[in-house]
Amino acid sequence: MTDKAAQAVRLFTSESVTEGHPDKICDAISDAILDALLEEDPDAHVAVETLVTTGQVHVVGEVRTSGYVEIPQIVRKTLVEIGFTSSDVGFDGHTCGVNVAIGEQSQEIGAGVDASTEVRSGTFEDDDQYGAGDQGLMFGYATNETPEFMPLPISTAHHLSRRLTHVRKEGIVPSLRPDGKTQVTFAYDENDVPTRLETIVISTQHDPEVTQEWLAEQLRTHVVEWVVNDADLSQYYTEDTELLINPSGSFILGGPMGDAGLTGRKIIVDTYGGMARHGGGAFSGKDPSKVDRSAAYAMRWVAKNIVAAGLADRAEVQVAYAIGRAKPVGLYVETFGTAHEGLSDADIQAAVNKVFDLRPAAIIRELDLQRPIYRQTAAYGHFGRTDVELPWEDTSRADDLRRAAGL
């Protein structure tokens, strides 16, 4: 650790992985299947899990739909798009085995979603029809550390991973293979403001003939320095920033041949890089009737609008549901002492209740979630994306929140 690191109040680290990481392959396949089913049937109920290992892809889960899709074809297409096109790179989407074991959604779960507790008790209103697909708690978070209202560490890690994939696919850095990871450590001061980029770690799969010295120079120039300029990180990136590229040495064997992968095993990468709490539910392969996904998106929507409205510098929002019930059983707002203009967290929570309807049917309608938009979220994060447009990143409710808070 450097002297400067020792003087920092805290060091905070976040990681990202590329789309060729085994777990992210699984997320991509599950979301590609989900998108294909939603294209056929917007009301489809989908819960699809994927496992990859050497030469094999296994797809399992539960589905209720009037549509039909060719799952093996979707699996192979997704693998080829990622870059697994030959056994030489550790996996071949053209020839791998694909095993599918998908059953019908439980009728009891389906009944609770289709007719909520409120409907069955005769006390329902508009948007009370659909109950939550499961119990659970979901968090959303936003901060003014970056223009996209995301924590700087996870934003930077994703930026590096996206660039690493770009230079591979475009041939800017030849001899790279799909699997890869990035990690960044930032120093924060006593006011929780990032001050320095302390360490960058990049591990990337590559062809056998590559030397680590050549690879380090290429990635320093075409990935690290490019991202520093593109993301305007020069105030954090200094001559003291430690750069570790493939610190364990060669990385030839990767992808599913190196490690088995599963859907839903990168939930911190998918969200806020550990800067905020997580309810535990994964996203990929789940249709929006599953509040694990839709309510987590809604919480990001709420938190981002709180910060965009200038009500706080940071906001974390929790919501909770009971299976089969439309109305949330809990809502909580935390601003970590950063609320503005004399507001309390309770004031902001009251404003949120006035502006946002957090029943599942309302979330699905307001964010237009019954459409094939999920494959693009399977890698590089579900939040704060600058490369794709996602409805939960909209901040048009900021003015409504200010009015509801009396500002």
From Swiss-Prot:
Binding site for Mg(2+): 23
Ligand binding (L-methionine): 62, 105, 259, 290
A single MF term (Gene Ontology): ATP binding
Location within or outside the cell: Cytoplasm
Region (Flexible loop): 105-115
A Pfam family recorded for this sequence: S-AdoMet_synt_N
Ligand binding (K(+)): 49
InterPro entries: ADOMET_SYNTHASE_CS, S-AdoMet_synt_C, S-AdoMet_synt_central, S-AdoMet_synt_N, S-AdoMet_synthetase, S-AdoMet_synthetase_sfam
Keywords: ATP-binding, Cytoplasm, Magnesium, Metal-binding, Nucleotide-binding, One-carbon metabolism, Potassium, Transferase
GO CC, alphabetical: cytoplasm
Similarity section: Belongs to the AdoMet synthase family.
Function noted in UniProt: Catalyzes the formation of S-adenosylmethionine (AdoMet) from methionine and ATP. The overall synthetic reaction is composed of two sequential steps, AdoMet formation and the subsequent tripolyphosphate hydrolysis which occurs prior to release of AdoMet from the enzyme.
Subunit structure as annotated in this protein's UniProt entry: Homotetramer; dimer of dimers.
Protein known as: S-adenosylmethionine synthase
